[in-house]
Amino acid sequence: VNFSKAYFGKGDADFQFVDFGNGNVTFEESKFHFGNVIFVNCTFGNGTTNFKKVTFNDGKVDFHFSQFGEGHKIFDQTVFGGGEVDFKRCDFGAGKTDFRRIHFGDGNVTFEESIFTSGKISFKSSDFGHGEVNFHMVNFGADSAIFDNAKFWTGNVSFYHSISSQLSFIECELETFVDLRVDKCGYLDLTDCINRDIIEL
């Protein structure tokens, strides 16, 4: 399925309940303008799912309840507008997941209760903007969750009751309250992290 470099104009882009089946799915370098983008309850089968360098507008971007099969999930260098970004209760399956170098805008960002079965998870060098950031009860699976060099601004950040083998915040900028009262974390790395508020452990 190939929507690379597609342009979605005025109105909502609604993919709710779509089953993309097995095989690669790409929206690389697509642009969404003037409406909400809805991938609620979608199924992405085994294969690469690619949203690299996608530009979203100021509407809500909603992936909640979606399922991803085995394979690489790529959201590298994606730009979100000012609306809410919702990955609540997603199942990211097995395989590497890249959210690197993303600009999340100033809307709230949630991955609450999502599951990553296995594979490295990277939010390295991403900018989370000024909205609230919620990783409450996320299960990061058997591999590392990397937030190195990410920027968290004025919105509160929560990893409350999350489970991970490793959480890395090397050289992060934490300008806000961060809740790290996790359920389980094998290794927590805050090396050279700049913290200007409270980190609750």
Give the label of every model feature segment:
Residues 1-201:
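N-terminal leader/targeting and pre-domain segments
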